[in-house]
From Swiss-Prot:
HAMAP family: GTPase_Obg. Its main location: cytoplasm. Keywords: Cytoplasm, GTP-binding, Hydrolase, Magnesium, Metal-binding, Nucleotide-binding. GTP binds at residues 165-172, 190-194, 212-215, 282-285, 310-312. The keyword Endoplasmic reticulum does not apply. One of its GO terms (biological process) is ribosome biogenesis. InterPro entries: G_OBG, GTP-bd, GTP-bd_Obg/CgtA, GTP-bd_prot_GTP1/OBG_C_sf, GTP1-OBG_CS, GTP1_OBG_dom, GTP1_OBG_dom_sf, OBG_GTPase. It comes from the Bacteria. This is GTPase Obg. The keyword Coiled coil does not apply. Its EC number is 3.6.5.-. The gene is obg.
Amino acid sequence: MFYDQAKIYVKGGDGGAGAVAFRREKYVPEGGPSGGDGGRGGKVIFIADEGLRTLVDFRYKRHYKADRGEHGQGKNMHGKSGEDMSVRIPVGTVVKDADTGEILADLIEHGQKVVVANGGRGGRGNARFMSNTNKAPTVAENGEPGEERNLLLELKLLADVGLVGFPNVGKSTIISRISAAKPKIADYHFTTLVPNLGVVELEDGESFVVADIPGLIEGAHTGAGLGHEFLRHTERTRLIFHVLDIAGSEERDPLEDFQIIAEELRQYSQELANRPILIVANKMDIPGAEENLQRLTEKLGEDYRIFPVSAATGEGLKELVYAAAKALPEIPAPQIFVRDEEQHKLTQASAPHRFELTREGDFFVVSGKEIEKHVQMTMFDREDGLYRFQNILKAMGIERALLDEGIKVGDKVRIAGIEFEWEE
């Protein structure tokens, strides 16, 4: 079975906690703090693999977590970083944030890598907090939680040419004729329910990949007849063969069919509608085809190249194939999006100090990515940790915001699930 979508969860490893320790050696009085830093958490990395063809593996395993960093120790010993988790996915997979819809990566080359969840940094040990005014700090940090997100994987076929058209117009027969593909062929609608890929090899050694896209119907852009699934496969193609039953063998008007499918492509994506199109007038061996071909040429001949063919006899297919081979080098590939680690770090580093203050019953609730990270990394069981957290509230403007909202001694504050009581 062909799977082209999967929803998974990924999480980078948490950073290890920093240590609180002091150097205690003979003949070294007042040795000072020696707590080492925690190790960085591992990353989750996707690697494109041309040997994979489907997303079926992600149906059975949906959670991917990298290793956490080890905790720091005394004698300034830093924790070991967590191991990265490498996950192989098929070439052609588009990776999206399932919650925001943001495209994180479009992996189109074998070996291409993208970091989809960064590991958290290790917490600092108390040796990092020594200053002229505090020679023996007893504060350290917990490790930063690893980045986590829900991902939507979409496998878009890496085909140069996509065959589109109503069901039963002969697309499967055409692809079986021009390539080595062996699709299921029968005289009923929706015979093709998954895309068929075939490689077309020319006599001069050139080749290109064609995809027999399952049959579209009117309303496909709204999802009718599995329309969204079918149209999704067309987006990656550079050239479209619009296949028509020119004989009208099922009592359909080929010109009307062309207009309906063209409108479905436009409704789904204007970029897709602007893709170069060759019209394939199939079933020329059936009576009535010549008359319809003349009518089609009169209406569309100035705007499109029309190729009369017969998939049953092979007539006209060679001319069609060579026309496609000539056109493809001049057609640019669809736009590619890649989110790499450095870009991601830059975005994170430039994020402003933002928070939101709301009321929930008796609680003042403070939310925001940065302050929640500080809560998770603070060791509240240590007095120095509490003191440092208070300074963070002041530096970020949260203390002033709470006072402006009328907070009083004894009122309750909640941040990242931790509850505090306000004091002077």
